[in-house]
């Protein structure tokens, strides 16, 4: 495969990112995004580019001063299986660590991909920032089919079983025994540079 490069998104990438998302909505694994929303947050994205075309993208979306989310992670179906998705997540994790976030989270139908990168599956309620920011307004809030996964980003941060052994979510009891996970030592590549937006408070 021709060399793939990873870089920070720009407003000019918004139409290509929008097409990627729209072309993959039928999978049921992505939430729709408006072109205006993508334009507003274009510099939060890392895009993968091959021969001048955007073939994959992912957004580092702040949920609070300490927690960021992997959002709108999508790889064009014609180039899947080439480790582009894992590379995007690694780039986001490195950028999140460089910006001082303590935790990177994702809500996904395919948690195994994230577990391979060091994430831990946790009950949804262990990511209250996401619940407050997005989930309570979602029509599937009480019957969500996604898994919550988290990755500690700060040096010295460990995931320990200090949370409750189980929580109630969506009317069912969810086992909640976390594993100890050492922080991944990720080096930022510079693909995603800080933006003015990163310094503003994120509303609940």
What is each stretch, according to the model?
Residues 37-51, 69, 142-145:
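A short helix-loop-beta-strand connector motif used in the catalytic cores of GNAT acetyltransferases and
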């Amino acid at each position: 495969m021709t060399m793939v490069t990873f870089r920070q998104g720009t407003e000019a990438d918004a139409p290509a990112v929008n097409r990627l998302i729209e072309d993959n909505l039928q999978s049921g694994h992505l939430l729709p995004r408006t072109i205006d929303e993508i334009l507003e947050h274009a510099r939060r994205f890392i895009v993968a580019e091959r021969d001048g075309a955007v073939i994959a993208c992912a957004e580092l979306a702040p949920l609070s001063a300490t927690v960021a989310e992997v959002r709108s992670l999508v790889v064009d179906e014609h180039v899947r299986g080439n480790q582009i998705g894992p590379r995007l997540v690694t780039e986001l994790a490195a950028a999140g660590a460089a910006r001082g976030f303590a935790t990177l989270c994702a809500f996904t139908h395919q948690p195994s991909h994230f577990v391979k990168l060091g994430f831990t599956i946790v009950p949804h309620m262990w990511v209250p920032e996401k619940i407050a920011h997005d989930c309570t307004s979602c029509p599937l809030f009480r019957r969500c089919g996604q898994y919550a996964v988290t990755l500690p980003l700060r040096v010295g941060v460990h995931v320990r079983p200090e949370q409750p052994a189980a929580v109630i979510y969506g009317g069912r009891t969810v086992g909640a025994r976390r594993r100890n996970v050492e922080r991944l030592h990720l080096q930022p590549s510079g693909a995603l540079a800080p933006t003015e937006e990163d310094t503003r408070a994120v509303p609940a």
